[in-house]
C-alpha cells in the first residue's frame, strides 16, 4: 500500500513537471533531447517535496521502534503495555527509499555536471553538422571542467594533509562534499533573495497602483533593449540575405549553409522587422566576401542564433508587460467609474467569479498571504541561525518537528516537514524562475523560453536538490554530523547515501559558521535594496520610489502603453470595417444574382421588348449594383498607422 501511495505522489509530481515545462517552453519546437533532459532535471528536483518528508517520517518510525525495544530490554514492563509503533502514511521499505534516493541524486549530478552543460553549448553552437556541434560543445566546456577538476584536486590534497585515508568510499564522500559545498553556496544566494522577495512580491501584488507604476517602468526599460535587439537582427539578416543572393552556385556547400542560417529567421520575425518584405542592401561585396570561409560562417551562424534568441526574449517580455499594463489600467478604470470589468470568457472559471476575484478578493488575499510568508521567513531564518545549538532545542523547525512527534504522533512530522520543505523550495525556486540575466537567461511563462535558458534552469535546479535536503535535515536536527547532535540514534536514507561532510573538517565546521551569517547578510542586503540603490547611483535603471529619473521613466512607459492601446484600437476598428465591408459585398452580390435570375425567368415566355428598353433596364441594374458596391467610407490600408 505504501508503494502505491508513493507511486501516486510521483505521478502528481510528473503532472506538475509536465505543466510547468509546457508553460515555460514550446515543446514542439524544441530539440527532443533538450526537452527530455530538462524534464528529468525538473522532475527530480520536485520529487524531494514528497520523498524527503516521507524519509523523515520513516526515520522517526525507526526511532520509535528503537526506543520501544530499549524499554523492553531495560524494564520488566509487559509487552502489551508498551505502545506499538504505528507505520506512517505511505510507508515503504528502507531499500526502496534508498534506491530511489540513489537514482534521484546521481541522475541529478550527471545531468548538472555533464549532460546539461554540453547540451547548452550544443544548442548555441554555430556549426552546421551534429559532429561539429558536439566538438564545439566539448571544446567550450573544457575550461569549465578543468576549473572544477582543479578545485576537486585541491580538496583532495587538503583531505590527505588532514590524514583522511583515500579509498573508494572516502573518494565518493569527497566528491559529493565538493559538489554539495558549491550547491550550498548557490542555495545561500537564492534563499537570501527568495526569503525576502517572495513576501515582498506577494504584498506588492495586492497594491495595484504600485504594480502599474512598476509595469510602466519595466516597459520603458525594455523599450531600448527591444529596439537594440531589432536593429541587431535587421543588420545580421541583411548581411545573410545579400550573402545568399551573391552565391549563384552551391560551391563547397556554402550556399546550403547560408540557407541554414536564413532558416533561423522565422516568418514572424521577418514580417515584424520588414513589413514590406524589402531588404535594403547596405553591405558591400568586400564585406560579404569575408564571410565565405567556414569559420566566418560558423561565427555568423552563432551570432544569428544569439540575436534571434535575444529578440524573441525581448518581444515576449514586451507583450507580457503591455498586456499587464492594459489589464491594470482597465481594472483601475472600472473600479473608479463603477463599470464592470470586461473579461474574456474562460471554460473553467465563470466571468463573474473572475471579476469578483480581481475586484474584491485579490488584494486582501495577497496581503494575508504576504503576512504568512513573512512569518515563515522569520521561522526559517531563526532555524538557520540556531540549528547547530543542540544542548537545548532552540531551532523552531526542530522544535516543531519534535513537538509534533512527541505530543501527537511521529507520523504528523511528515506534514510539518512537508510544510517547511515546500516553503524552502518555493523561496529557492522562486528566484530561479524570476531570475533574469541580461541577454542570457530568462524564463518566459508564456512558452517563449529559449533552449539555452530552459537548460540553465535545469542545471540550477539539479544543483540545488542535495543542498536543500542537507540544509533541511540540519534545521530539524536529523543530520547528526551537521548539527553535532549524537542522541538521535538513526539516520535518514538520504544521509546514508550521501555520507557526511565531516570527512573534510573545514567544510563541516564552515557550514555551522558561515551558512547562517551569509543568509542573514544577503537577506538584509535584499531587504534594504542595497544593490538596487548602488546600481541606480552608478547609472543603471532601477525602480526607486520618489526618484525623479524613475518618475520620468514611468511617464514614458505610460505613453508607450497609450500608443499600444491606440494601435490595438485602430486594428480592431479596421478589422470590424473590413468584416462589415465583406458582409456587405456578399449580401449585395447575392441580391444582384437573385434579381438577375428572377428577371430571366419572368422574360422567358414574354414577347421580346425593344432593344433600347432592354439596354436601359440593364443599365439601371448595373448602376444600382455599382452604387451598392461603393463603400460609404474608404477602408484604410492595412498596417498604415502601425508603421507610423
Curated annotation (Swiss-Prot):
Cytoplasmic side of membrane: 28-31, 124-145, 194-369, 434-453, 524-644
Basic and acidic residues compositional bias, start-end: 567-576
Carbohydrate-modified residues: 73
The keyword Electron transport is assigned to this record: no
Coiled-coil regions listed in the entry: 216-245
A Pfam family of this chain: LMBR1
Region annotated Disordered, chain positions: 567-644
Major localization listed first in the record, in broad terms: membrane
Bias-annotated ranges (Low complexity): 578-594
GO cellular component: membrane; plasma membrane
Membrane-spanning residues: 5-27, 32-52, 103-123, 146-166, 173-193, 370-390, 413-433, 454-474, 503-523
UniProt cross-references to InterPro entries, sorted A to Z: GPCR-associated_LMBR1, LMBR1-like_membr_prot
Function per UniProt: May associate with G-protein coupled receptors and regulate downstream signaling pathways.
Family listed: Belongs to the LIMR family.
Descriptive protein name: G-protein coupled receptor-associated protein LMBRD2
Amino acid at each position: 500500500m505504501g508503494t502505491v501511495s508513493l507511486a501516486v505522489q510521483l505521478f502528481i509530481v510528473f503532472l506538475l513537471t509536465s505543466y510547468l515545462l509546457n508553460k515555460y517552453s514550446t515543446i514542439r519546437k524544441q530539440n527532443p533531447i533538450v526537452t527530455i533532459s530538462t524534464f528529468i532535471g525538473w522532475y527530480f528536483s520536485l520529487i524531494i517535496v514528497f520523498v524527503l518528508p516521507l524519509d523523515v517520517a520513516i526515520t522517526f518510525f525507526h526511532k520509535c521502534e528503537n526506543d520501544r525495544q530499549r524499554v523492553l530490554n531495560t524494564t520488566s514492563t509487559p509487552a502489551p503495555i508498551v505502545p506499538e509503533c504505528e507505520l506512517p502514511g505511505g510507508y515503504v521499505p528502507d531499500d526502496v527509499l534508498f534506491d530511489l534516493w540513489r537514482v534521484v541524486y546521481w541522475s541529478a549530478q550527471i545531468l548538472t555536471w555533464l549532460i546539461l552543460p554540453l547540451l547548452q553549448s550544443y544548442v548555441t553552437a554555430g556549426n552546421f553538422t551534429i559532429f561539429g556541434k558536439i566538438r564545439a560543445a566539448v571544446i567550450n566546456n573544457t575550461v569549465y571542467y578543468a576549473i572544477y577538476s582543479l578545485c576537486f584536486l585541491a580538496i583532495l590534497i587538503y583531505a590527505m594533509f588532514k590524514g583522511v585515508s583515500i579509498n573508494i568510499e572516502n573518494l565518493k564522500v569527497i566528491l559529493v562534499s565538493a559538489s554539495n559545498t558549491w550547491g550550498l553556496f548557490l542555495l545561500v544566494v537564492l534563499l537570501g533573495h527568495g526569503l525576502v522577495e517572495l513576501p515582498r512580491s506577494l504584498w506588492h501584488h495586492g497594491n495595484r497602483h504600485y504594480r502599474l507604476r512598476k509595469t510602466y517602468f519595466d516597459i520603458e526599460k525594455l523599450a531600448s533593449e527591444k529596439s537594440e535587439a531589432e536593429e541587431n537582427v535587421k543588420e545580421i539578416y541583411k548581411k545573410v540575405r545579400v550573402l545568399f543572393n551573391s552565391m549563384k552556385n552551391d560551391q563547397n556547400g556554402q550556399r546550403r549553409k547560408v540557407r541554414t542560417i536564413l532558416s533561423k529567421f522565422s516568418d514572424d520575425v521577418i514580417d515584424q522587422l520588414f513589413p514590406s518584405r524589402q531588404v535594403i542592401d547596405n553591405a558591400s561585396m568586400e564585406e560579404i566576401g569575408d564571410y565565405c570561409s567556414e569559420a566566418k560562417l560558423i561565427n555568423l551562424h552563432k551570432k544569428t542564433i544569439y540575436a534571434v534568441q535575444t529578440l524573441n526574449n525581448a518581444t515576449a517580455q514586451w507583450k507580457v508587460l503591455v498586456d499587464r499594463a492594459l489589464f491594470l489600467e482597465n481594472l483601475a478604470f472600472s473600479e473608479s467609474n463603477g463599470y464592470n470589468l470586461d473579461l474574456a470568457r474562460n471554460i473553467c472559471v465563470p466571468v463573474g467569479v473572475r471579476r469578483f476575484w480581481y475586484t474584491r478578493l485579490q488584494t486582501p488575499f495577497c496581503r494575508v498571504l504576504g503576512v504568512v510568508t513573512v512569518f515563515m521567513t522569520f521561522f526559517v531564518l531563526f532555524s538557520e541561525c540556531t540549528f547547530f545549538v543542540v544542548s537545548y532545542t532552540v531551532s523552531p523547525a526542530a522544535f516543531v518537528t519534535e513537538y509534533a512527534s512527541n505530543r501527537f504522533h511521529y507520523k504528523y512530522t511528515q506534514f510539518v516537514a512537508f510544510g517547511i520543505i515546500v516553503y524552502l523550495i518555493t523561496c529557492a525556486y522562486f528566484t530561479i524562475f524570476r531570475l533574469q540575466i541580461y541577454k542570457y537567461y530568462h524564463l518566459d511563462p508564456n512558452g517563449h523560453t529559449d533552449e539555452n535558458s530552459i537548460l540553465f534552469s535545469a542545471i540550477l535546479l539539479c544543483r540545488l536538490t542535495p543542498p536543500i535536503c542537507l540544509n533541511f535535515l540540519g534545521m530539524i536536527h536529523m543530520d547528526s554530523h551537521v548539527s553535532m547532535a549524537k542522541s538521535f540514534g538513526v539516520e535518514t536514507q538520504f544521509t546514508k547515501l550521501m555520507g557526511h561532510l565531516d570527512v573534510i573538517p573545514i567544510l563541516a565546521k564552515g557550514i555551522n559558521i558561515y551558512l547562517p551569517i551569509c543568509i542573514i547578510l544577503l537577506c538584509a542586503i535584499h531587504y534594504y535594496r542595497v544593490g538596487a540603490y548602488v546600481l541606480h547611483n552608478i547609472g543603471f535603471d532601477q525602480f526607486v520610489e520618489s526618484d525623479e529619473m524613475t518618475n520620468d521613466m514611468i511617464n514614458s512607459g505610460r505613453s508607450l502603453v497609450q500608443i499600444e492601446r491606440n494601435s490595438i484600437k485602430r486594428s480592431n476598428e479596421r478589422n470590424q470595417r473590413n468584416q462589415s465591408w465583406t458582409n456587405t459585398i456578399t449580401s449585395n452580390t447575392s441580391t444582384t444574382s437573385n434579381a438577375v435570375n428572377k428577371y430571366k425567368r419572368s422574360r422567358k415566355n414574354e414577347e421580346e421588348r425593344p432593344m433600347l428598353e432592354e439596354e436601359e433596364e440593364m443599365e439601371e441594374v448595373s448602376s444600382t449594383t455599382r452604387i451598392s458596391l461603393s463603400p460609404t467610407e474608404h477602408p484604410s490600408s492595412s498596417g498604415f498607422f502601425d508603421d507610423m
